[in-house]
């Protein structure tokens, strides 16, 4: 197996890759950043509510579609964000409490800067 030791990326390039591939995961980061740590069921509800509020406010054509229509979609989203190191969880009994990691906070700050720069 050949190691990829000759590949180097700056932190800015890493953040760029994460931003480009975040997709709907931005909603989970946004919720956890704004509301703090929470369990998966609550996260699911909040993500759908935040997205609904955004659509009503910005697009004026909310059709009632949820961004995360199923628990399966939520599981995929949280697994992707965990794998990228953007969120983490603590198990309390059988409940997982999700929160934004330091890397997730760096990404959120970078996204905020980019939005301000584009406005």
Curated annotation (Swiss-Prot):
Reported phenotype of the disruption mutant: Increased expression of TubZ.
GO molecular function annotation: DNA binding
Keyword Transcription among record annotations: yes
Outcome reported for the amino acid change (mutating residue 82 to R): Decreased DNA binding
Transcription regulation in keyword set: yes
Top-level taxon of origin: Bacteria
Keyword vocabulary terms for this entry: DNA-binding, Plasmid, Plasmid partition, Repressor, Transcription, Transcription regulation
Induction annotation: Probably part of the tubR-tubZ operon.
Outcome reported for the amino acid change (mutating residue 94 to A): No DNA binding
GO BP: any one term: plasmid partitioning
Domains (record comment): Although this has the same function as TubR of B.thuringiensis subsp. israelensis there is little sequence homology and the dimerization interface is different.
Subunit structure: Homodimer. Binds to TubZ filaments via the C-terminus of TubZ. DNA is not required for binding to TubZ.
Function per UniProt: A DNA-binding protein that is part of the type III plasmid partition system used to ensure correct segregation of the pBc10987 plasmid. Binds TubZ filaments but does not influence the GTPase activity of TubZ with or without DNA. Cooperatively binds to multiple regions in tubC (centromere-like site) upstream of its own gene with consensus sequence N(T/A)ATTNC(C/G)GNAAT(A/T)N; probably forms an extended DNA-protein filament. Binds sites in its own promoter region and presumably represses its expression; its effect on RNA expression has not been shown.
Name this protein carries in UniProt: DNA-binding protein TubR
Natural source organism: Bacillus cereus (strain ATCC 10987 / NRS 248)
């Amino acid at each position: 197996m050949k190691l990829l030791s000759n590949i180097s990326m700056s932190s800015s390039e890493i953040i760029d890759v994460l931003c480009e591939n975040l997709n709907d995961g931005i909603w989970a980061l946004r919720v956890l950043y704004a509301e703090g740590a929470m369990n998966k069921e609550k996260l699911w509800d909040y993500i759908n509510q935040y997205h609904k509020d955004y659509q009503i406010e910005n697009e004026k054509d909310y059709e009632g579609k949820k961004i995360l229509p199923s628990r399966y979609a939520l599981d995929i989203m949280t697994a992707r964000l965990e794998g990228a190191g953007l969120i983490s969880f603590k198990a309390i009994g059988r409940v997982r409490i999700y929160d934004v990691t330091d890397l997730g906070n760096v990404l959120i700050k970078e996204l905020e800067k980019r939005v301000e720069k584009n406005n």
